[in-house]
Amino acid sequence: MTATRAPRAARGRVPLDQRGFDFSRPDDIVCGVDEAGRGPLAGPVVAAAVILDPAQPIEGLDDSKALSAKKRDALYDLIVARSRAYCVASASVDEIDTLNILHATMLAMKRAVEGLSLMPTLAQIDGNRCPTLMVRAEAIVSGDALVPSISAASILAKVTRDRMLVELHARHPVYGFDVHAGYGTAKHLAALREHGPCEAHRRSFAPVRAALDLIR
């Protein structure tokens, strides 16, 4: 595993013994990997892995958070249609509560890479940590804004998770999952206090535990 350094403003914590290495090779099959949903109080964490096709470039790829919902949806369709391979995977709320959110995120990323129909030789991961994989892995801080395949993965993960939360909203409309995607907005926290958590809430997260205490 290695970590590539982004420009100074984008740097995060990277272990000293992982800086300055570059394991890429000219003949590598590279997949980009990113996640969506580490911070929310409800719903799964979703990860995606994407191997882009250089013969079918996709214009406009960027960090999913920097794009409008309409632009993300349009790029989602292009990524699915033009990529050499892609896979979207997740870790459940139960897995998040059992493992903790970091390890559940690594699990979702591992599932996404291992679910690709084409085996990569190098996985480039957004952030400063890599899951344990059967292929070489490189962590890239702010990779979702720097590496097109990671940008593509961030879009697939974000769009997929947002759609999951819209479906969850249909079952539990009192929380407003279709608006905040499970994040701890003021309205979401107020609904938690009033109604208590549903089965999709992460009980290992402090605001959810606090809401549980109120109804006991």
Swiss-Prot record:
Lipid metabolism recorded as keyword: no
**What main location does UniProt list?**
cytoplasm
Among PROSITE patterns, the record links this protein to: RNASE_H_2 (PS51975)
Keywords attached to this entry: Cytoplasm, Endonuclease, Hydrolase, Manganese, Metal-binding, Nuclease
Where does this polypeptide localize?
Cytoplasm
Please tell me one Gene Ontology term that the record gives under cellular component. Answer: cytoplasm
Q: Name the InterPro entries on file.
A: RNase_HII, RNase_HII/HIII, RNase_HII/HIII_dom, RNaseH-like_sf, RNaseH_sf
What name does this protein carry?
Ribonuclease HII
Query: What organism does the record attribute this protein to?
Result: Burkholderia vietnamiensis (strain G4 / LMG 22486) (Burkholderia cepacia (strain R1808))
Name of the gene: rnhB
